[in-house]
A protein has these predicted regions:
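Single conserved hydrophobic/aromatic residue that forms the stacking wall/gate
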Residues: 1-11, 15
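Short, solvent-exposed loop/helix junctions and linker helices
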Residues: 5, 78-84, 210, 227
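Thiamine diphosphate
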Residues: 19-29, 33-39, 109-110, 114-266
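Short, hydrophobic alpha-helical segments
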Residues: 43-47, 241
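Flexible, glycine/charged-enriched surface loops at secondary-structure junctions
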Residues: 47-62, 248
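A short, charged, Gly/Pro-tolerant segment at domain boundaries
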Residues: 55-67, 253-259, 265
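Active-site diphosphate/adenylate-binding microenvironment
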Residues: 60-142
Length: 266
């Protein structure tokens, strides 16, 4: 829109530039969180009616449409495994006592569409900057802070390579964290733009191997599972948690070279 009733800016040095990009009836300069807290309190104090049901219902309808469009992938028996089928199987194993951590690019984008975490504060990921490698550090802290909960990491194979050896730390401290690697043998989010711009003969440092990361974790003293068929996923995850050890489930998934299938970022 060309005009908005209200916007909030996070930095005071933009005071003189209010309205440069977007016209406003009222510009507020200050901390975004504090501003919204004050506005919320003002709405309550003035008893202003707020009804977001129409907007919420529109979002729910769009979400359902996207879920229906992805259903064939989520039910796929394809081998290598469809990434969304992997995510569906993971979702079936998520319980109320679980903290889920996403550490990857494509696989986390897919997982976030399918996995329903039980409550606020039970999902963590690299955030908007995509700082890969946070999976095991987040998991170590989460498991130590909440020893009564189960902690699950959803990894891309590339991101596992950054801090995967911290499974050694989990073994030494007896923290039964379970990781699941969506292994497509690629840095997918870098591979596709390279191929699109330069062709498949000019890919640089984006192709990986179908490495047996599960054997790495076993060598460190943990439990490993290697999965190549959709029906094997959920039983492998169950065995991983039941092992009582830090564990890794290494799942071979389809590599989408020309575009991540089902990749609507909504």
């Amino acid at each position: 829109p060309r005009s908005t009733p209200l916007y909030s800016s996070a930095a005071s040095d933009v005071y003189k530039r209010q309205g440069d990009n977007r016209a406003a009836d009222l510009g507020l300069v200050g901390n975004i969180g504090m501003n919204f807290q004050l506005m919320t309190q003002e709405i309550e104090d003035r008893d202003v009616p707020v009804d977001v049901s129409r907007y919420r219902d529109q979002l729910r309808e769009r979400e359902q449409q996207l879920d229906n469009a992805r259903r064939d992938q989520m039910d796929s028996e394809e081998v290598p495994i469809d990434p969304l089928r992997l995510c569906r199987e993971i979702a079936s194993c998520v319980s109320d006592d679980m903290i889920v951590i996403g550490d990857g690019g494509d696989i986390v984008a897919q997982a976030s569409k399918v996995i329903q975490v039980p409550r606020n504060g039970t999902w963590m990921d690299p955030g908007p900057l995509g700082t890969l490698g946070v999976g095991m550090p987040f998991a170590l802290a989460a498991q130590k802070a909440h020893p009564d909960k189960r902690v699950l990491i959803v990894y891309g194979d590339g991101s596992f390579g950054l801090n995967g050896f911290e499974f050694d730390t989990a073994v030494r401290f007896g923290l039964p964290i379970v990781g699941i690697v969506g292994n497509d043998a690629a840095w997918g989010q870098m591979m596709r733009p390279q191929e699109m711009l330069y062709g498949e003969d000019r890919l640089v440092a984006v192709e990986l191997n179908r490495t047996r990361y599960d054997l790495v974790v076993e060598a460190l003293g943990g439990h490993g599972e290697h999965v190549v068929a959709p029906g094997e996923i959920a039983p492998a995850i169950t065995r991983a948690f039941e092992s009582g050890k830090p564990a890794l489930v290494n799942v071979e998934i389809r590599q989408d070279r020309t575009g991540m299938k089902g990749s609507t970022y909504v």
